[in-house]
A protein has these predicted regions:
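Membrane-associated alpha-helical segments
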Residues: 11, 51, 61-185
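Hydrophobic alpha-helical transmembrane segments
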Residues: 196-204
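Short helix-loop junctions at transmembrane helix boundaries
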Residues: 187-195
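Long, non-coiled-coil amphipathic alpha-helical linker/lever segments
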Residues: 34-51, 55, 118-122, 128
Length: 204
């Protein structure tokens, strides 16, 4: 995850980032081609739009993977699937944080009186804001799905443990009388009349 900061003035836009960011590199040729036709706000919109579009395939990939995990058989898959679901949930949290920051920037730009916008600029920023809201809602839905997968896994493990305990209880119930008989006749009593009986062996 890369971080980019922007300062937008009346006749300029400055970006700050620690490494080359492909979204910036992607729009530079367009700006150089048309020159002054793009206002700083238009350039800002282009950059944010590219970033949001870059989020879409990432979110879609995570969504598809969570759908696959939801269909898995926990008995065969084991805890590795749970760890993967939790890891994907963490990725969604980071994506949501990035989208939230961009939403705040766009919202402040729209409501600020110090930002002079044309009607077209305002329309562009409203569109990108709606896209950010939509992607945030998709992320929230997938985070809930990841949480449901975790809950289902916990429920599965609980049922599995209960079944094991039930099986052990049945086995203990079967062997308890046998243990009692073995313990009783393993004692060194001098007189045990039933042992002298001709059917005593079969009875015991």
């Amino acid at each position: 995850y890369e971080t980019i900061k922007m300062v937008v003035g009346k006749n300029y836009i400055v970006t700050f980032h620690l490494s080359h960011i492909r979204y910036v590199n992607k729009i530079v040729p367009k700006i150089l081609q048309r020159g002054s036709q793009y206002s700083p706000l238009h350039v800002m919109h282009m950059l944010v739009s590219e970033i949001v579009e870059g989020y879409i395939p990432i979110i879609s990939k995570i969504e598809n993977r969570l759908d696959e995990i939801e269909e898995f058989d926990f008995f065969k898959s084991g805890s590795n699937i749970l760890y993967e679901a939790l890891e994907l949930r963490g990725d969604l949290f980071k994506l949501r944080r990035g989208l939230r920051l961009m939403r705040e920037v766009i919202h402040r730009s729209l409501v600020s009186r110090r930002v002079e916008m044309t009607d077209n600029d305002r329309k562009y920023f409203h569109d990108i804001y709606d896209d950010l809201v939509q992607q945030t809602e998709i992320i929230e839905a997938n985070r809930e799905l990841a949480s449901d997968i975790r809950e289902n896994f916990m429920t599965y493990n609980s049922l599995k443990s209960n079944n094991i305990m039930m099986t052990l209880t049945v086995i203990s119930t079967i062997f308890l009388p046998l243990t009692f008989i073995v313990g009783l006749y393993g004692m060194n009593f001098k007189t045990m009349p039933e042992l002298e009986w001709q059917y005593g062996y079969f009875l015991i």
